[in-house]
């Protein structure tokens, strides 16, 4: 089947992600949640694809299955529970461990199992699995934004699937005999250039769509463990289990040296910090926006800001949806001045760098059939 999404020479992984997200949105190929940007798309036909996974011999023969918690893999989780397999899901953002095991209550009905397979069920019916439990995983099922028939995979950009697999390899939970499957829409299968693939990226053995079962025969190795030299110490603070794994590997005599910030990069970072020091009121406005308040009461910003002007906003888009989108894209402004009736809005940022980054990201978004127009306006004193 000829790929419907083409990757041009010189395009980055983020270019590919935006192409896929925009294509799925404009073609209306996804179910809730929408928009699909910054998500593993819950594509139409996901249940049919999951049913194909359940029919695979490697699924039937697996005793322990690790499945991502994203919505399109819900059918695989349900199939695993119905087949009485040991079902593992990643701990959210790896904050408190690596795995949770879904444990349905005794005498669970089909409806209870269905609930257990959902995001709500994962919260209510799961227990953490510790590093000492020595889990052996037979099959890994991951979501993807884009994949190739060669087994190359591009996720949503946070790196958790890659990190989870590397951590499992570090723990001895996966081996060369562990299969990796991804469940996607046909449009997500494309020719991914090899130069976009890095050594920490997770490869897939099977691609399952609603219409196809593709065995990739991937030649690239999967991660064999954590590449400590690619991690900063800040990442260990965010993911505590990494500290434990690093200690274990260090005790085993392995090289666990972390990535060092280059002197030039450090000087550049310091110079940027000197150019703009965070204002207490800016931090307060940021928190107010994050808690769904349009603006903080009692004051207007009294420091230099740069405005991003949005036009051609979809008529049905609500300000709450825009806020959610800005959070997902990690371009939260100090303040939003909403003029939905006129299909425009003004986003206030603390400095030109933040505004410029937001403009570049927002210009690529395709929401509800519309491309939002974003333009950076010169700094002003508010």
Curated annotation (Swiss-Prot):
Keyword RNA-binding: yes
SUPFAM superfamilies (UniProt xref): NagB/RpiA/CoA transferase-like, RNA-binding domain, RBD
Coiled-coil annotated spans: none
Domain RRM residues, every copy: 306-382
Any single Pfam family the record assigns to this protein: 5-FTHF_cyc-lig
GO terms assigned for molecular function: RNA binding
Keywords: RNA-binding
InterPro entries for this protein: FTHF_cligase (IPR002698), FTHF_cligase-like_sf (IPR024185), MTHFSD_RRM (IPR034359), NagB/RpiA_transferase-like (IPR037171), Nucleotide-bd_a/b_plait_sf (IPR012677), RBD_domain_sf (IPR035979)
GO cellular component, one term: cytoplasm
Alphabetized PANTHER family for the sequence: 5-FORMYLTETRAHYDROFOLATE CYCLO-LIGASE-RELATED, METHENYLTETRAHYDROFOLATE SYNTHASE DOMAIN-CONTAINING PROTEIN
Name assigned to this protein: Methenyltetrahydrofolate synthase domain-containing protein
Species: Danio rerio (Zebrafish)
């Amino acid at each position: 089947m000829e790929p419907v999404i083409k990757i041009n020479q010189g395009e980055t992984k983020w270019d590919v992600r935006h192409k896929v997200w925009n294509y799925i949105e404009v073609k209306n190929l996804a179910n809730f949640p929408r928009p699909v940007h910054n998500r593993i798309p819950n594509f139409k036909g996901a249940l049919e694809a999951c049913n194909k996974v359940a029919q695979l011999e490697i699924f039937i023969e697996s005793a322990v299955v690790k499945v991502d918690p994203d919505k399109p893999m819900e059918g695989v989780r349900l199939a695993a529970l119905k087949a009485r397999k040991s079902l593992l899901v990643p701990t959210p953002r790896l904050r408190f461990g690596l795995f949770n095991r879904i444990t349905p209550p005794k005498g669970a009905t089909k409806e209870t199992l269905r609930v257990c397979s959902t995001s709500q069920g994962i919260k209510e019916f799961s227990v953490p699995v510790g590093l000492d439990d020595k889990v052996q995983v037979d099959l890994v099922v991951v979501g993807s934004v884009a994949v190739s028939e060669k087994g190359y995979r591009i996720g949503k950009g946070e790196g958790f699937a890659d990190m989870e697999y590397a951590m499992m390899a570090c723990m001895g939970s996966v081996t060369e005999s562990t299969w990796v499957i991804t469940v996607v829409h046909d449009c997500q299968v494309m020719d991914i250039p090899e130069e976009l693939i890095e050594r920490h990226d997770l490869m897939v053995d099977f691609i399952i769509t609603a219409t196809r079962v593709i065995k990739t025969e991937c030649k690239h190795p999967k991660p064999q463990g954590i590449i400590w030299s690619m991690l900063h110490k800040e990442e260990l603070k965010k993911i505590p289990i990494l500290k434990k794994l690093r200690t274990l590997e260090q005790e085993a005599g392995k090289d666990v040296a972390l990535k060092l910030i280059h002197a030039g990069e450090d000087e550049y970072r310091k110079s940027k910090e000197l150019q703009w020091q965070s204002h207490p009121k800016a931090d307060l406005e940021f928190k107010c926006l994050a808690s769904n308040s349009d603006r903080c009461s009692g004051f207007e910003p009294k420091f230099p800001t740069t405005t991003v002007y949005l036009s051609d906003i979809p008529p049905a888009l609500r300000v709450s949806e825009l806020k959610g989108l800005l959070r997902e894209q990690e371009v939260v402004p100090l303040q939003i001045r909403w003029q939905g009736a006129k299909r425009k809005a003004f986003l206030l940022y603390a400095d030109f760098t933040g505004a410029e980054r937001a403009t570049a990201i927002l210009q690529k978004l395709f929401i509800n059939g519309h491309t939002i127009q974003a333009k950076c306006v010169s700094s002003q004193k508010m």
